[in-house]
């Protein structure tokens, strides 16, 4: 009988992992975990339904990490300050909580699902007040910070200034009528201009006793009719020649406070240039800048002195023409400049240092621009003390000898 020994099953020895293998397994598990989180991140975000306050179709807004960004809400609904929804238990509107920073809308306790949200917008009066305060602050900042570069910047102030100038030139103004006969009545004065167009306002200025002052004002119904009046070189009203002009531009001032002048000095002229040529050249040039601008007056001094003055109805057109520097009239290049008004303070001929009394009045009287006064008496010659000779002079007359010192025969001064 054979010796039977029990067979013992031998299990294979456990595999011993090296440290390198353990590191590889840890990295593999980390990669799997990262892949799962990436898959969660790439899933579509949750959307909430927001009703447009204007009654349009609702809009779905995305959420980021369970919150709605205020920038997303305001980009979709300008002026929005928050969200609200209807509480089914109480029937009242419940506002969505805003975080302290004011940048996020926190989800309700039961989440964003199954709810329709409505936009909360500030009242219009508060928005207007906020916008006006912001505009006032920015305007104050511009006023403080832009004093130096306001002339060089062609910003909003420059555009508004040009807009006001265009609006002023596009509306009829009160035209001044000079040289009106003192016997002309208001009816005759108005009838003359009604033959040209529709008169809105017409008046002859009178004194307190009712007598005419010799001038008046008229306003036409449109700029076109006003230009018709200004285009007539001579107006004969009640048998008398009258001048019709736009009121003096010195009453209008630019933003620096300087007067706006519409009178142009034209130099380098020859006697071959006449008034008609100046009117045509400057009228066409003015209309190229301001459509309603016309030449209101041309003055050529007599006797001819080589220059003239051209007055336009628009100061802006005059400035633009002068900025060119020169124009060609009858084949001749003429010089241009703004005709500055003569200041009253600069009419004296100069200081009167060291002059005797009475010479100042004499110089004022002899000024070429001074009007003579009728029956004016001539000024008396001032008393001027004759020059004194302080050198020794022999005095031999008996009258002078009495002033000598007693006993001195050589005369005074010895």
From Swiss-Prot:
<keyword id="KW-0539">Nucleus</keyword>
<keyword id="KW-0804">Transcription</keyword>
<dbReference type="InterPro" id="IPR000504">
    <property type="entry name" value="RRM_dom"/>
</dbReference>
<dbReference type="GO" id="GO:0003723">
    <property type="term" value="F:RNA binding"/>
</dbReference>
<feature type="domain" description="RRM 1">
    <location>
        <begin position="173"/>
        <end position="259"/>
    </location>
</feature>
<dbReference type="Pfam" id="PF18694">
    <property type="entry name" value="TDP-43_N"/>
</dbReference>
<dbReference type="GO" id="GO:0000785">
    <property type="term" value="C:chromatin"/>
</dbReference>
<dbReference type="GO" id="GO:0005634">
    <property type="term" value="C:nucleus"/>
</dbReference>
<dbReference type="GO" id="GO:0003682">
    <property type="term" value="F:chromatin binding"/>
</dbReference>
<feature type="compositionally biased region" description="Basic and acidic residues">
    <location>
        <begin position="1"/>
        <end position="44"/>
    </location>
</feature>
<keyword id="KW-0677">Repeat</keyword>
<comment type="subunit">
    <text>Interacts with chromobox protein homolog hpl-2; interaction may maintain localization of hpl-2 to gene bodies.</text>
</comment>
<feature type="compositionally biased region" description="Basic and acidic residues">
    <location>
        <begin position="153"/>
        <end position="167"/>
    </location>
</feature>
<dbReference type="InterPro" id="IPR012677">
    <property type="entry name" value="Nucleotide-bd_a/b_plait_sf"/>
</dbReference>
<feature type="compositionally biased region" description="Basic and acidic residues">
    <location>
        <begin position="361"/>
        <end position="373"/>
    </location>
</feature>
<keyword id="KW-0805">Transcription regulation</keyword>
<feature type="domain" description="RRM 2">
    <location>
        <begin position="262"/>
        <end position="341"/>
    </location>
</feature>
<feature type="region of interest" description="Disordered">
    <location>
        <begin position="132"/>
        <end position="167"/>
    </location>
</feature>
<dbReference type="GO" id="GO:0008380">
    <property type="term" value="P:RNA splicing"/>
</dbReference>
<dbReference type="GO" id="GO:0005737">
    <property type="term" value="C:cytoplasm"/>
</dbReference>
<keyword id="KW-0507">mRNA processing</keyword>
<dbReference type="GO" id="GO:0006972">
    <property type="term" value="P:hyperosmotic response"/>
</dbReference>
<dbReference type="Pfam" id="PF00076">
    <property type="entry name" value="RRM_1"/>
</dbReference>
<dbReference type="GO" id="GO:0008340">
    <property type="term" value="P:determination of adult lifespan"/>
</dbReference>
<keyword id="KW-0346">Stress response</keyword>
<protein>
    <recommendedName>
        <fullName>Tar DNA-binding protein homolog 1</fullName>
    </recommendedName>
</protein>
<comment type="function">
    <text>RNA-binding protein which regulates transcription, splicing and RNA-editing. Limits the accumulation of double-stranded RNA by maintaining the abundance of the mature RNA transcripts that are formed from double-stranded precursor RNAs. Stress response protein that acts downstream of daf-16 in the insulin/IGF pathway to regulate longevity and the cellular stress response to osmotic, oxidative, proteotoxic and endoplasmic reticulum stress. Involved in the regulation of physiological processes including aging, fertility, growth and locomotion.</text>
</comment>
<dbReference type="InterPro" id="IPR041105">
    <property type="entry name" value="TDP-43_N"/>
</dbReference>
<keyword id="KW-0508">mRNA splicing</keyword>
<dbReference type="GO" id="GO:0010628">
    <property type="term" value="P:positive regulation of gene expression"/>
</dbReference>
<keyword id="KW-0963">Cytoplasm</keyword>
<dbReference type="GO" id="GO:0003727">
    <property type="term" value="F:single-stranded RNA binding"/>
</dbReference>
<dbReference type="GO" id="GO:0010468">
    <property type="term" value="P:regulation of gene expression"/>
</dbReference>
<feature type="region of interest" description="Disordered">
    <location>
        <begin position="1"/>
        <end position="58"/>
    </location>
</feature>
<dbReference type="GO" id="GO:0006979">
    <property type="term" value="P:response to oxidative stress"/>
</dbReference>
<dbReference type="GO" id="GO:0006397">
    <property type="term" value="P:mRNA processing"/>
</dbReference>
<feature type="region of interest" description="Disordered">
    <location>
        <begin position="343"/>
        <end position="414"/>
    </location>
</feature>
<dbReference type="InterPro" id="IPR035979">
    <property type="entry name" value="RBD_domain_sf"/>
</dbReference>
<dbReference type="GO" id="GO:0005654">
    <property type="term" value="C:nucleoplasm"/>
</dbReference>
């Amino acid at each position: 009988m054979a010796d039977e020994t029990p067979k013992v099953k031998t299990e294979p020895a456990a595999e011993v992992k090296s440290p390198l293998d353990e590191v590889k397994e840890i990295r593999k598990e980390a990669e799997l975990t990262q892949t799962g989180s990436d898959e969660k991140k790439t899933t579509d975000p949750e959307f909430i339904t927001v009703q447009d306050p204007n009654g349009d179709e609702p809009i779905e807004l995305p959420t980021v990490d369970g919150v709605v960004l205020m920038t997303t809400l305001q980009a979709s609904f300008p002026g929005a300050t928050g969200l609200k929804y209807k509480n089914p238990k109480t029937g009242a509107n419940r506002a969505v909580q805003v975080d302290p920073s004011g940048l996020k809308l926190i989800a309700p306790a039961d989440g964003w699902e199954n709810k329709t949200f409505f936009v909360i917008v500030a009242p219009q009066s508060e928005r207007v007040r906020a916008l006006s305060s912001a505009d006032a602050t920015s305007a104050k900042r511009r006023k403080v910070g832009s004093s130096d570069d306001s002339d060089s910047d062609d910003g909003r102030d420059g555009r508004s200034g040009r807009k006001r100038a265009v609006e002023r030139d596009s509306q009829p103004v009160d035209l001044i009528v000079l040289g009106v006969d003192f016997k002309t009545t208001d009816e005759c004065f108005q009838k003359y201009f009604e033959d040209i167009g529709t008169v809105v306002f017409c008046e002859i200025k009178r004194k307190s006793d009712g007598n005419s002052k010799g001038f008046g004002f008229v306003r036409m119904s449109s700029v076109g009719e006003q230009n018709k009046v200004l285009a007539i070189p001579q107006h004969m009203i009640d048998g008398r020649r009258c001048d019709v002009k736009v009121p003096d531009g010195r009453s209008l001032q630019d933003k620096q406070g300087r007067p706006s002048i519409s009178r142009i000095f034209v130099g380098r002229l020859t006697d071959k240039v006449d008034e008609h040529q100046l009117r045509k050249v400057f009228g066409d040039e003015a209309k190229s800048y301001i459509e309603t601008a016309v030449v209101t007056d041309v003055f050529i001094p007599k006797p001819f002195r080589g220059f003239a003055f051209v007055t336009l109805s628009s100061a802006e057109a005059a400035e633009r023409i002068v900025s060119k520097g020169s124009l060609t009239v009858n084949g001749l290049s003429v010089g241009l400049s703004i005709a500055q008004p003569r200041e009253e303070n600069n009419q004296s001929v100069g200081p009167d240092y060291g002059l005797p009394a009475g010479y100042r009045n004499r110089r004022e009287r002899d000024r070429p621009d001074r009007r003579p006064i009728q029956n004016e008496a001539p000024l008396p010659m001032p008393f001027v003390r004759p020059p004194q000779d302080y050198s020794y002079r022999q005095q031999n007359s008996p009258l002078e000898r009495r002033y000598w010192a007693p006993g001195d025969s050589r005369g005074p001064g010895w």
